[in-house]
From Swiss-Prot:
The keyword Nucleotide-binding does not apply. Residues 1-12 form a transit peptide. The keyword Iron does not apply. It is found in: Mitochondrion. Residues 94-105 have a biased composition (Polar residues). The gene is RRG9. Keywords: Mitochondrion, Transit peptide. Belongs to the RRG9 family. GO terms for cellular component: mitochondrion; nucleus. Residues 86-117, 218-240 are annotated as: Disordered. This is Required for respiratory growth protein 9, mitochondrial. Required for respiratory activity and maintenance and expression of the mitochondrial genome.
Length: 264
């Protein structure tokens, strides 16, 4: 019997060969490495046949041990049974379960947070408008010259019924704006009135032609002599009173003139 210290074997070709070594009476220990599995031979009880005296007769078949074919082949090939390292200590290395990135960085504590990104100019102005106009953007309303004349006519006929507050609520304006309209004494001249009429006529013609192209209104007949028709229209308009002219223009602009119904 030979007492043999641990000697690492080469990688086994198959697991079946390792099982046969275990069945033959060889004690093996399984050791793990980073790359692969290795078997180390801890203790070989015997590598050859037992030499028994002739007078001894075996009582059972288990008393005689025969080496496995693998052990015989290794002995025939001159496999050295001397230990390579007598004082070798096997240390197991385990990989770290926590990644390096998750470990706390001492320098990270000293670094402060990034400063807030500077807002753009249009965003700052938008926030300022939201704070200033909480109900939304409501620019001051501007009345047309004809609507201004209608406000004056209504207030002149019945100041108690058509007061400043009533007119401001109807025209969706501030009472101060209505008060300034009533206080103002400016009136357009005849030349300015004529330019205004021509502008409204061109606008009416442009809108009518556009609606007729869409099929919403019938085609408009072109006048044979525009100069004569223009002069006749100007004469008829000059004969009409101011409130009727204003009512006609307001109806064309799809405005509900409250004061037109009262003046009729």
């Amino acid at each position: 019997m030979f007492g043999i210290t641990s000697r690492p074997y080469h990688r086994w070709s198959s697991f079946a060969q390792a099982l046969r070594i275990l069945q033959s009476g060889t004690t093996l220990a399984l050791e793990l490495d980073h790359s692969s599995l290795f078997f180390s031979k801890r203790n070989i009880t015997s590598c050859c046949h037992h030499t028994k005296p002739a007078s001894h007769t075996p009582t059972s078949s288990n008393s005689i041990w025969t080496p496995s074919p693998l052990a015989e082949s290794r002995l025939r090939s001159g496999y050295s049974l001397k230990p390579a390292h007598t004082n070798r200590v096997v240390t197991r290395r385990y990989a770290s379960t926590t990644p390096k990135d998750s470990q706390p960085d001492p320098q990270a504590k000293t670094v402060s947070k990034r400063p807030a990104k500077k807002m753009e100019q249009w965003r700052l102005q938008k926030e300022a408008l939201k704070k200033k106009f909480q109900e939304g953007w409501a620019p001051p309303k501007r009345l047309s010259p004809d609507a201004i004349e209608g406000v004056r006519e209504l207030h002149q006929q019945n100041p108690q019924k058509f007061s400043t507050a009533v007119l401001a609520e109807h025209f969706k304006m501030s009472p101060e704006a209505i008060r300034r309209i009533l206080k103002s004494k400016w009136r357009p001249s005849e030349k300015e009135m004529e330019k205004r009429r021509e502008r409204w006529e061109r606008r009416e013609t442009r809108i009518w032609d556009h609606m007729s192209e869409l099929g919403l209104r019938p085609l408009r007949k072109r006048p044979s002599s525009p100069a004569s028709d223009k002069s006749s229209d100007a004469e008829t308009r000059n004969r009409q009173p101011l409130h009727s002219i204003a009512s006609t223009l307001l109806i064309q602009r799809d405005i509900s003139p409250m004061w037109v119904l009262l003046l009729r």
